[in-house]
Structure formats: structure tokens, C-alpha cells
């Protein structure tokens, strides 16, 4: 007879749960004993019941097995964390270096702004003056470039206005000339009205050729 597959989930019935716990615990310890004998392995197993009772099995002294396990885990943990510690130490050194660079830049910036100059030597003051002159030169170049760009824009606008003035002047000249010679400029209404003869005689009778 084929045994049905048991669904793995919590057994709700307390009595059935205790019976199953006892059977499975005995089976587990039996398998652990067989593994230690057949493979000459150091095996230990500990189980706490739902009520907190301890059940244990060990192929040798369980304390020695636990001690061996603790030493292994400590060595494993150290081996695993060593690269991490090195990485963290590297980050700390990098952070210290960056902080020092920031401090140097802040001091330099204050000196460039004319602050904290009392502690500067003649050489440092000369270097600061040279850097200020370079900065002023760059500012002047940038200012001149902006002025030149603005001047070019104004000149371009001036050319556009001149062209527009010439175009309007030419248009006005042509219009004046056409008015002087008596021609109607394009788009202007005519000053004379054409006469049209319309025949409006009343005729009664058959249609004939009219004279």
C-alpha cells in the first residue's frame, strides 16, 4: 500500500503534534548517529520543544563540538569581515585627505578675499597678488567680450533700421511719382467713374430683330 504524501504545515491537534515531535526527534537523532558512524563525522544536534525542553545528541562531547563550532565561526567571521574593514579604513583615510584639502581651499579662499592675511609671508602675499591680477585680467576679458557682443547686436539692429528706412523712402518716391503723372497707384481707388449705357426700353409683342 502506497503511503500518501503528508502536507508540511503546523499540526493543529496538540496530541498529534506531540506524538509527531517524539517520532521525528527520534528519527533525526538516529540519522545523526548513523551519519557519525558511517562517515566518521563529528555530529551534534540540539532540539528545543515547544515547551522549552532541550533534547540533544552528540557523537562526542557536545561541549567540545560547540566550542569547535564557535572557533570556526569566529575565524570565518574575521576572514569575511577583513576585506570590509580594509575598505572602511580606506574610506576613512580618503575622507581625512578630503577634509584637509577642503580646509586648505577655505584658507586660500579667505586670503583671496582679503581675510586672514596677518599670518601670510611676503612670498604668499606676492602669490596672492599675482592670482588676483590674473583673476582681474580674466574679468576684464570677459567684460570686453560681453561689450563686443552687445555692440555687434546694436550694429546689426542699426543696419536693419537703415534698410527699412531706405525701403520706405523708395516706396514713397515711387508713389509720389505715380501721383504726379496721373496714374493710379496699385491698390488705390480710381478717381474717375466709367460711364456705361444701359438699354431700358419697354417692348411688347413678338421678338424681332430690332434696329
UniProtKB/Swiss-Prot annotation:
Keyword list, A-Z: Developmental protein, Differentiation, DNA-binding, Flowering, Nucleus, Transcription, Transcription regulation
Origin: domain of life: Eukaryota
GO CC aspect terms: nucleus
Cellular compartment(s): Nucleus
Mutant lacking the gene: phenotype: No visible phenotype under normal growth conditions.
Domain K-box, chain residue ranges per copy: 88-187
InterPro entries assigned to the protein according to its UniProt record, in alphabetical order: MADS-box/MEF2_TF, MEF2-like_N, TF_Kbox, TF_MADSbox, TF_MADSbox_sf
Function: MADS-box transcription factor that acts with AGL42 and AGL71 in the control of flowering time. Promotes flowering at the shoot apical and axillary meristems. Seems to act through a gibberellin-dependent pathway. Interacts genetically with SOC1 and its expression is directly regulated by SOC1.
Name by which UniProt lists this protein: MADS-box protein AGL72
UniProt source species: Arabidopsis thaliana (Mouse-ear cress)
UniProt gene name: AGL72
Amino acid at each position: 500500500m502506497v503511503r500518501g504524501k503528508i502536507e508540511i504545515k503546523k499540526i493543529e491537534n496538540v496530541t498529534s503534534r506531540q506524538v509527531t515531535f517524539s517520532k521525528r526527534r527520534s528519527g533525526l537523532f538516529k540519522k545523526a548517529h548513523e551519519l557519525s558512524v558511517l562517515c566518521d563525522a563529528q555530529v551534534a544536534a540540539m532540539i528545543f520543544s515547544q515547551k522549552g525542553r532541550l533534547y540533544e545528541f552528540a557523537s562526542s562531547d557536545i561541549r567540545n563540538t560547540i566550542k569547535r563550532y564557535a572557533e570556526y565561526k569566529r575565524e570565518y567571521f574575521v576572514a569575511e569581515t577583513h576585506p570590509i574593514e580594509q575598505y572602511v579604513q580606506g574610506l576613512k583615510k580618503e575622507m581625512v585627505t578630503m577634509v584637509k584639502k577642503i580646509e586648505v581651499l577655505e584658507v586660500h579662499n579667505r586670503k583671496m578675499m582679503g581675510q586672514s592675511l596677518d599670518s601670510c609671508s611676503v612670498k604668499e602675499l606676492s602669490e596672492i597678488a599675482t592670482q588676483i591680477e590674473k583673476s582681474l585680467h580674466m574679468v576684464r576679458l570677459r567684460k570686453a567680450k560681453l561689450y563686443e557682443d552687445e555692440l555687434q547686436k546694436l550694429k546689426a539692429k542699426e543696419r536693419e533700421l537703415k534698410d527699412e528706412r531706405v525701403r520706405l523712402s523708395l516706396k514713397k518716391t515711387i508713389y509720389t511719382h505715380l501721383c504726379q503723372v496721373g496714374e493710379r497707384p496699385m491698390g488705390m481707388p480710381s478717381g474717375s467713374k466709367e460711364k456705361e449705357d444701359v438699354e431700358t426700353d419697354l417692348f411688347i409683342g413678338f421678338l424681332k430683330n430690332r434696329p
